[in-house]
């Protein structure tokens, strides 16, 4: 779905005036944009058949819409200029994996791991990219390769050479007794680039490669014997990534429109998709302001900051307007103050993805009464994505994400001591957010290509530059 905000007057005015004044002012804002899932895509059969059957044709059509010499696009220029007079990263090409994009007639069956599929079953370990750590050959598992995702190993963890990311994932799964589901065929490819896409298949691969549950449990038992030390360590981690600063970032960019409630929300003569696009366009301008308030983000190299913002903007915007909409009945509340009702979304042909936002995000957030500190931590986890393509130091980003995990866990234990499973429930919203974000991004590209929906300048520029989906 799309995000929330007002339409930007003129790109020249907005980008030069707004960003040069506010982005240097250490403010921060991000919202989460979710675009529309089409229920009636058959209305464009010819176009769909010719242009949307594969990544090559999509790229060709998109590139043809870009102005010459503008390969990097406005988001790079605006974000980079707001962070300092540094050189911009080299432009990259929109390079989807070597397979066909999911057919648009199955958009409603979105999967968080549908982009790339290996041969059925874990036999995919025998593929060329996995031969370095094939099956039962200990010699093949070098100390430099993670047996789960192929990233650089940091040592042997729970019986298997693995990276810090897979080690932490396996430990959290066992300690929190998390149960995952695969939205696809339980045969998702797990590699460095997309290890976070399907938690079920990642966990199954951890087990298949030999990670031992009992090793985590034994480690936990030992840690209980050192509870004082652990408490001190947790306190130290919370100080490194203070939840107060994360909350401040959320409040600093809060559009302050909750007062509308369910009654008295402004109506609009525009269709829902147009309203959402306009709202998303405005919220994108506050993305940098929010991110710069998140601890340690501004300490990363400029190029990495740009990559992380561009890799996560859609999920960040979606999370924001979903949380903002918990008090709305059967609809979402945009940052512009406009209310988009479920019925109008269905009439506009975007009912399917709209319903997913309501049931998988808004409803869940409402049921658990998710507060803004928890929302901010989840969005910070999305922001610090070590799998974003092109990072100069993915390990550093991974470490920052782990700090946010620790901060969120500590916060939930202190604030909600009677809800021991709350931390796990919060983390389980991330796969749904990723899945919905990817599908909304596909629909945003579709709306852009068919030209039926006005997408404001900044959002259009964002789409015309390569987007790192990893």
Swiss-Prot record:
Residues 217-242 are annotated as: Disordered. Residues 212-235 are annotated as: Hinge. Residues 1-145 are annotated as: Modulating. Its main location: nucleus. CDD domains: NR_DBD_RXR (cd06956), NR_LBD_RXR_like (cd06943). Residues 146-211 bind DNA. GO terms for molecular function: nuclear receptor activity; nuclear steroid receptor activity; nuclear thyroid hormone receptor binding; protein heterodimerization activity; retinoic acid-responsive element binding; sequence-specific DNA binding; zinc ion binding. GO terms for biological process: cell differentiation; nervous system development; positive regulation of transcription by RNA polymerase II; retinoic acid receptor signaling pathway. Residues 238-466 form the NR LBD domain. Pfam families: Hormone_recep, Nuc_recep-AF1, zf-C4. It is found in: Nucleus. The keyword Transcription applies. Residues 217-229 have a biased composition (Basic and acidic residues). InterPro entries: NHR-like_dom_sf, Nuc_recep-AF1, Nucl_hrmn_rcpt_lig-bd, Nuclear_hormone_rcpt_NR2, Nuclear_hrmn_rcpt, Retinoid-X_rcpt/HNF4, Znf_hrmn_rcpt, Znf_NHR/GATA. The keyword Cytoplasm does not apply. Belongs to the nuclear hormone receptor family. NR2 subfamily. Composed of three domains: a modulating N-terminal domain, a DNA-binding domain and a C-terminal ligand-binding domain. Homodimer. Heterodimer; with a rar molecule. Binds DNA preferentially as a rar/rxr heterodimer. This is Retinoic acid receptor RXR-gamma. It comes from Xenopus laevis.
């Amino acid at each position: 779905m799309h995000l929330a905000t007002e339409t930007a007057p003129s790109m020249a005015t907005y980008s030069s005036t707004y960003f040069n004044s506010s982005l240097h002012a250490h403010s921060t804002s991000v919202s989460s944009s979710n675009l529309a899932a089409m229920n009636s895509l058959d209305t464009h059969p010819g176009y769909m058949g010719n242009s949307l059957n594969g990544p090559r044709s999509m790229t060709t059509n998109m590139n043809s819409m870009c102005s010459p010499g503008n390969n990097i696009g406005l988001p790079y220029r605006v974000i980079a200029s707001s962070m300092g007079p540094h050189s911009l990263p080299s432009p990259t090409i929109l390079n989807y994996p070597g397979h066909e994009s999911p057919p648009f007639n199955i958009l409603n069956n979105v999967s968080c791991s549908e982009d790339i599929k290996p041969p059925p079953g874990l036999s995919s370990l025998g593929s060329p990219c996995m031969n370095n750590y094939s099956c039962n050959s200990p010699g093949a598992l070098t100390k430099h390769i993670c047996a789960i995702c192929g990233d650089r190993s940091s040592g042997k963890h729970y019986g298997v050479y693995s990276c810090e990311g897979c080690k932490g994932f396996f430990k959290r799964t066992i300690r929190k007794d998390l149960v995952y589901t695969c939205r696809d065929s339980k045969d998702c490819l797990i590699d460095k680039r997309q290890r976070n896409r399907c938690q079920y298949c990642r966990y199954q691969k951890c087990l298949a490669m030999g990670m031992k549950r009992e090793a985590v449990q034994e480690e936990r038992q030992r840690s209980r014997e050192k509870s004082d030390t652990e408490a001190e360590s947790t306190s130290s981690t919370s100080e490194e990534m203070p939840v107060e600063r994360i909350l401040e970032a959320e409040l600093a960019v809060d559009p302050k429109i909750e007062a509308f409630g369910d009654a008295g929300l402004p109506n609009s003569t525009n269709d829902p998709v147009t309203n959402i696009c306009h709202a998303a366009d405005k919220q994108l301008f506050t993305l940098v302001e929010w991110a710069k308030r998140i601890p340690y983000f501004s300490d990363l190299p400029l190029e990495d900051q740009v990559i992380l913002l561009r890799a996560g903007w859609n999920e960040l915007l979606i999370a924001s307007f979903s949380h903002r909409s918990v008090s709305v009945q059967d609809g979402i509340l945009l940052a512009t103050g406009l209310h988009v009702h479920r019925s109008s979304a269905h009439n506009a042909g975007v009912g399917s993805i709209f319903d997913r936002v309501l049931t998988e995000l808004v409803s869940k957030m409402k049921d658990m009464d998710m507060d803004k500190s928890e929302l901010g931590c989840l969005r910070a986890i999305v922001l610090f994505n070590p799998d974003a393509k092109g990072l100069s130091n993915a390990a550093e980003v991974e470490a920052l994400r782990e700090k946010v995990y620790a901060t969120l866990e500590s916060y939930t234990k202190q604030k909600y001591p009677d809800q021991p499973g709350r931390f796990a429930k919060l983390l389980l919203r991330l796969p749904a957010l990723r899945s919905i974000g990817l599908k909304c991004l596909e629909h945003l590209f579709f709306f852009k290509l068919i030209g039926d929906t006005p997408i404001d300048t900044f959002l259009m520029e964002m789409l015309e530059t390569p987007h790192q989906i990893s």
